[in-house]
């Protein structure tokens, strides 16, 4: 009896020891618990935050270049309240830790290993939870869509959670218009000192910063606080169909009367407030003492912009123009049955499903084999049909549902006659994968077109190409403002809209209705200026009107992102929030150039004035793009 009791006690002690070891190991393998609700305590500019928007021209402590400085100098806060796409714009990681909003952090656990797979960070005035992935997942493609919160991965380095975020939308680093670009990377360090959470964030921006910008915020636990809802509803004060009345409030270069207000108020030299990196270092103090503050708060400053960021377009133009590379063609699923094929010239939209494939544009001829391979791969990734409720009519259900047929390309729709969008027409029509819509083998390449639609475009595109690029010319055309395909394709309507006098007189956009995807061609490019061609009927006003039509057709999911997805002619997958930014950029540059024309400036004088300088880091990095754009405007 005593022996049994001793054994029981020994077994209990052993079990307790094992559990203690397991518990200790679990604690050692677990990161610090950052979950909970946190409220703002302090940050570097805390004394300045209660007065609302930062004063114009106040950029102290920032490491911005002249391109960013010009963007901020011409910024008007009225832009945010005027644009429905900006009224509810959340703040991204480039600024959010400064924003005084309460923060809630939750865990997302792997259901099998029970380890933390991600943290969810939700901020009061944001579009939703920001996922910080801790499972070493790879970053998305360079062509993947951008968002306000970006794509974030995290890793614990001792007690510090280090977060790296990319794929960000263009945003801000201060509320008075200092921008952060869509190429920015943000690195954050979060570390716990109960009950405080220290949040250090570093912005690395090749477009708008001369060196990394490091800032910090301090938060404290608020165990009884919950985040309130944030039902931000944007207001469009324009009547339906009146987007031509929309204007972008902004200051013309050299006309902002508020750039000296802060320096005058603090009786400090203007150079201390203009955001030069060298002004952050102790040795600059002696230089600052030799400078004088402005004599009045409303002196209209005439800034001189002359650093390296002002010569982006010049350096691009000095490079020889070369054919686009097509070594890395890839497909991205967009929505529904629609994929984006990128890296083979202009972007291609492809509806892939049981009816076959409709392509919007065909890319570069040299990339045709890779484009066809990408379409074939995407088609084989489609989920096989579900097993029917009734008995199977097939001898082998698995083989019947997994035997993928060669996808048939039924039609190519060309958005314009630009070479990067049409030069693959002949090669793709001649491939074994091409089987025209509504036709059998008799209607393959070289036979009579009959009722077959093979390559489709606006009539102006066909007429122009028959005069110089006949081998790739469309076989079928439309003449009206809108054309709807005669039948549903892959279970959705396909509509084609003529956008007259935009980039050319024959531009089309293609709307896949059920998937809610619009392919714009070169009307919208997420990383270059539009290639407006006056000789072929293009114009800046027609281009802006075309973008307005795209915006009228699209909706956002929440807070100016998501919803209708936009496949641009070039660049990364976008949404209507991105298109709105692009449209506003064109309107600002148009206004600047028109002002110069009104002053009697010649084309060469306009070019020398660099009216696009602050946007060139975003859209002017390819040879000849900026010069041709300015000439067209």
Question: Positions of the model-derived regions?
Answer:
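Accessory terminal helices/loops
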Residues: 317-319, 437, 556-563, 572-633
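Metallo-beta-lactamase
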Residues: 356-358, 362-366, 380-381, 443-506, 513-514, 545-554, ...
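PEST-like low-complexity, intrinsically disordered acidic/proline/serine-rich tracts
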Residues: 27-315, 440-441
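Active-site metal-binding motif and surrounding structural segment of the metallo-beta-lactamase
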Residues: 355-358, 366-442, 485
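Bacterial N-terminal signal peptides
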Residues: 10-22
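Mature N-terminal segment immediately following signal peptide/propeptide cleavage
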Residues: 27-51, 321-355
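Conserved beta-strand hairpin/beta-sheet module of binuclear metal-dependent hydrolase folds
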Residues: 330-390, 508-522
């Amino acid at each position: 009896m005593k022996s049994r009791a001793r054994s029981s006690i020994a077994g209990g002690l052993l079990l307790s020891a094992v559990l203690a070891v397991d518990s200790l190991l679990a604690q050692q393998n677990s990161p610090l618990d950052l979950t909970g609700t946190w409220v703002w305590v302090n940050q570097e500019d805390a004394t300045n935050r209660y007065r609302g928007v930062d004063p114009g021209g106040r950029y102290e402590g920032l490491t911005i270049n002249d391109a960013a400085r010009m963007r901020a100098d011409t910024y008007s806060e009225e832009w945010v309240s005027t644009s429905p796409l900006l009224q509810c714009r959340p703040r991204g990681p480039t600024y959010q830790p400064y924003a005084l909003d309460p923060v809630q952090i939750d865990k997302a656990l792997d259901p099998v290993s029970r380890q933390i797979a991600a943290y969810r960070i939700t901020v009061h005035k944001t579009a939703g939870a920001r996922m910080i992935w801790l499972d070493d997942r790879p970053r998305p493609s360079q062509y993947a869509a951008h968002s306000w919160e970006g794509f974030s991965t995290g890793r614990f380095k001792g007690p510090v959670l280090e977060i790296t975020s990319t794929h960000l939308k263009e945003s801000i680093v201060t509320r008075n218009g200092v921008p952060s670009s869509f190429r920015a990377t943000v690195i954050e360090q979060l570390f716990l000192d109960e009950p405080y959470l220290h949040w250090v964030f570093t912005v690395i921006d090749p477009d708008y910063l001369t060196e990394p910008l490091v800032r910090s915020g301090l938060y404290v636990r608020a165990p009884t606080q919950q985040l309130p809802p944030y039902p931000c509803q944007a207001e469009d004060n324009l009547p339906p169909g009146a987007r031509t009345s929309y204007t972008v409030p902004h200051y013309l270069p050299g006309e902002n009367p508020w750039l000296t207000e802060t320096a005058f108020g603090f009786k400090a030299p203007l150079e201390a407030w203009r955001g030069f990196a060298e002004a952050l270092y102790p040795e600059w103090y002696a230089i600052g003492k030799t400078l004088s503050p402005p004599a009045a708060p409303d002196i209209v400053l005439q800034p001189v912009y002359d650093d390296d960021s002002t010569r982006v377009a010049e350096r691009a133009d000095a490079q020889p123009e070369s054919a686009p590379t097509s070594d890395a063609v890839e497909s991205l699923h967009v929505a529904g049955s629609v994929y984006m094929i990128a890296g083979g010239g202009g972007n291609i939209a492809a509806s892939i499903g049981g009816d076959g494939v409709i392509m919007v544009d065909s890319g570069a001829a040299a990339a045709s084999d890779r484009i066809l391979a990408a379409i074939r791969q995407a088609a084989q990734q489609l989920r096989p049909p579900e097993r029917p409720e009734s008995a199977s009519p097939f001898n082998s259900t698995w083989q019947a549902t997994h035997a993928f047929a060669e996808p048939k390309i039924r039609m190519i729709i060309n958005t314009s006659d630009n070479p990067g969008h049409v030069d693959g027409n002949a090669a793709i029509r001649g491939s074994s994968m091409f089987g025209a819509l509504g036709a059998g083998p008799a209607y393959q390449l070289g036979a009579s077109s009959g009722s077959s639609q093979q390559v489709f475009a606006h009539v102006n595109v066909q007429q122009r190409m028959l005069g110089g690029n006949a081998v790739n010319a469309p076989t079928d055309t439309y003449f009206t403002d809108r054309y709807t395909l005669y039948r549903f394709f892959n279970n959705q309507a396909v509509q084609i809209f003529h956008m007259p006098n935009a980039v050319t007189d024959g531009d089309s956009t293609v709307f896949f209705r059920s998937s809610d995807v619009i392919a714009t061609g070169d009307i919208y490019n997420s990383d270059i200026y539009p290639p407006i061609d006056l000789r072929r009927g293009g114009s800046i006003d027609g281009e802006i009107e075309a973008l307005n039509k795209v915006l009228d057709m699209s909706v956002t999911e929440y807070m100016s992102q998501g919803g209708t997805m936009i496949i641009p002619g070039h660049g990364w997958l976008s949404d209507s929030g991105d298109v709105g930014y692009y449209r506003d950029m064109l309107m600002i540059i148009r206004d600047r150039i028109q002002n110069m024309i009104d002053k009697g400036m010649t084309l060469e004088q306009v070019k020398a004035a660099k009216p696009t300088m602050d946007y060139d880091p975003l859209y002017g990095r390819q040879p000849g793009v900026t010069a041709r754009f300015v000439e067209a405007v």
